């Protein structure tokens, strides 16, 4: 039975997901339904957490909009997610960057990762 479930989940995995790490800045385009219309909405932020669970994988993006911190969790393989683009690679030494929630301004900056 579990082989059938694994096979179905394998078929639903997206193949065009770029590799990214915590600290990277991503732009995620998501389909948003407003009434009877569908449109793409872009969300650009820093990856503060990644949860790798196969089909149930997710990542958390954080950005500051009008002085207010906004965090959004995206399911990596969701059909609502249209595209994921890596804008900038960040150099960090932790897997979870929850400490950025308490920081603002220059102390919340992340160095750029150079090279590979």
Swiss-Prot record:
Superkingdom field: Bacteria
Keywords for the protein's UniProt record, in alphabetical order: Ribonucleoprotein, Ribosomal protein
GO biological process assignments: translation
GO CC field: cytosolic large ribosomal subunit
Pfam families referenced in this protein's UniProt entry, alphabetically: Ribosomal_L19
GO molecular function, one term: structural constituent of ribosome
NCBIfam families: rplS_bact
Family (UniProt): Belongs to the bacterial ribosomal protein bL19 family.
Function: This protein is located at the 30S-50S ribosomal subunit interface and may play a role in the structure and function of the aminoacyl-tRNA binding site.
Protein name, as recorded: Large ribosomal subunit protein bL19
């Amino acid at each position: 039975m579990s082989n059938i479930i694994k096979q179905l989940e394998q078929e639903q995995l997206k193949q065009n997901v770029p590799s990214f790490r915590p600290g990277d800045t991503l732009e995620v385009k998501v389909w948003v339904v407003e009434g009877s219309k569908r449109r793409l909405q872009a969300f650009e932020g820093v990856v503060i957490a990644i949860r790798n669970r196969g089909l149930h994988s997710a990542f958390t993006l954080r950005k500051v909009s009008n002085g207010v911190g906004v965090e959004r969790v995206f399911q990596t393989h969701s059909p609502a997610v249209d595209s994921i683009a890596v804008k900038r690679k960040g150099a960090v030494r932790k897997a979870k960057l929850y400490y950025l929630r308490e920081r603002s301004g220059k102390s919340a900056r992340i160095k750029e990762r150079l090279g590979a």
